[in-house]
Every structure is written in C-alpha cells, then in structure tokens.
Regions:
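N-terminal structured helix/loop subdomain that forms the ligand-binding/catalytic interface
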Residues: 1-124
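A glycine-rich, hydrophobic loop/mini-helix early in the fold
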Residues: 111-155
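Helix-hairpin-helix/helix-loop-helix acidic hairpins
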Residues: 137-182
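Conserved small/polar residues in nucleotide/adenosyl-binding loops
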Residues: 184-190
Length: 191
C-alpha cells in the first residue's frame, strides 16, 4: 500500500513531513505511469518511522537494483520510479531552492542521477512525446535553440508576480498555469 496519509494526518511533525515527501515523490512518478516497487514502499516506511535515514534508504534502493542481473522493460521503469522517488523525497525535505535556470537544471540532475546519462542537461534537440494524460497526443514543446531564453523568461515573469494580491483560488490557478507553461517548455530530456 502506497498511502502515507496516516503519517500526514496523524503523525509527529517529522513523520508528517517525510510521509508527505514520499507520497508526493511517488505521485509524481505516477503522472508518467510509473509505479514503485514494494521494496521502495517498505524502505519509505522505515525512513518515515526513523528506523533508517534518507542516506540509508538511498543506499538500500541502489543495492537492491545492483543485485538484479537482468531487467525487463517493466523492471527498468520500476527502477526509475524507485530511484527518482528517493531523490525527490530528499529534495522535498531540504530547506533550500534556487529559482533560477541553474537551480532547475540542478534539481533535474539530482532527481535523475543514476537513471539517465543526460540528467541535468538542457536538451539540444527538438522532441515530441506521446502523453498518456492527453490520450496519446503530444504537447507542443519549445524548440531546442529557444529553450534557455523561454525558461529564463518564465522564471522572470514568475519572480515579478505578486502573490499577496490573489486569494487562495487565484493562487492555485496561477501556479497551475505557471507549471503548465513551464512543462510545455520542458528544458530537459526525460526519456
């Protein structure tokens, strides 16, 4: 069971934070149709309970996959989900963030380190990608030569936005729009 809701609702503050981070990390993998292994769920629970640290969780996941000889395509996807989830969990509980292009590429590198050789690199080629959430249609992505400027523009627009002038619904709407636009500018390779 992947539901960490019990920790989020009833847990001590540290367990709540870790539970929320794991649930978010695993949920982000689900957006791409990826499912974590039962081993990751067990490891996440140990981390939440304080039985192991995030460093130990990361090492356990790494060792788990190093011990596997051959991988089917499904196992490769599970490996991606487990490794990225562990990396995202670590990032979400850190108290730092650089709202810059360098900061975003650093996040990409840290999430996909050990999964993709191009982790943290801005793509230098044009892409199309069939999205299951769009029933197989593709998003129109920004052309590779224009990516850096497009992302820098988006970040600058976001920096200038005054969050104090919108209510909660306006805030959610604004963030959703920013994420949507940023996604269509997708700076980094993902597959």
């Amino acid at each position: 069971m992947m539901d960490f809701e019990e920790y989020i609702r009833q847990g001590e503050p540290q367990k709540r934070e870790k539970g929320y981070a794991w649930q978010t990390a695993i949920g982000l993998q689900a957006v791409d149709g990826l499912k974590p292994s039962d081993y990751l769920i067990e490891t996440a629970r140990k981390d939440i309970e304080g039985e192991i640290t995030i460093d130990e969780a990361e090492q356990l996941i790494k060792s788990y996959y190093q011990s596997k000889e051959a991988r089917t395509p499904e196992e490769a996807e599970t490996h991606e989900a487990d490794t990225a989830s562990t990396n995202i969990r670590r990032l979400l509980t850190e108290k730092t963030f650089a709202f810059t292009l360098v900061g975003l590429t650093s996040i990409h590198r840290r999430i996909f380190d050990g999964i993709f050789k191009f982790a943290g690199q801005i793509r230098d080629y044009n892409i199309t990608k069939k999205e299951w959430v769009l029933r197989g249609d593709t998003v129109l992505y920004v052309s590779a030569p224009d990516l850096r400027k497009a992302i820098e523009y988006d970040l600058e627009q976001e920096r200038q936005f005054d969050y104090s002038k919108v209510d909660r619904n306006g805030l959610v709407s604004h963030i959703a729009k920013f994420v949507s636009v940023s996604y269509t500018h997708l700076t980094l390779p993902t597959t």
